[in-house]
Amino acid sequence: ALQQGDIDMVWAYSTGVAGTYQDVLSTDTNVSLVNVAAANAPAVLAFNNAKGLFSDENLRQAVSYALNYEEFKTYFGSAYAEIPNRGFVPSTTVGYTDTEKLTTDTAKADEYMKAAGYTEKNADGFYVNADGAAAAFTLTVNAAKETHVGYAEMIKTQLEAFGIQV
């Protein structure tokens, strides 16, 4: 509708224009895009730190380094997408303290798994501890948000390829 002149403006306050549309709209000479740094966290992977698998910080760090952020950027971002920094607070927040970019480093993720006591992999390719229990967890997602379901599917695929059962 925007490209055909049926509407004059798209305003999606909390989400902006989806990355897949940004790439198309950016080449249209009749459309102007205004890009503003995000002041929110559109997707967050939150852990239960109090009990279970992720009560061990080493496992949370392993997940962080096992994920392929370039793949997330490619599939869910746009030409304007950037891999965020570590931490929960967006850089546009007043008082923000700079942190390093999220990076993929499966060797470092493997070191964190070993530090948590998951030193071997079973026949299915999942890390196991000394008791033979696999590193496994349940990922819960709001199914009403299609993009979040896509994030969850990619997280599952990437972590299971690394050796954590989801």
Question: What are the functions of these language-model segments?
Answer:
Residues 51, 92-93, 163:
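Short amphipathic alpha-helical interaction patches enriched in hydrophobic/aromatic residues
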Residues 2, 8, 139, 157-166:
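Periplasmic binding protein-like
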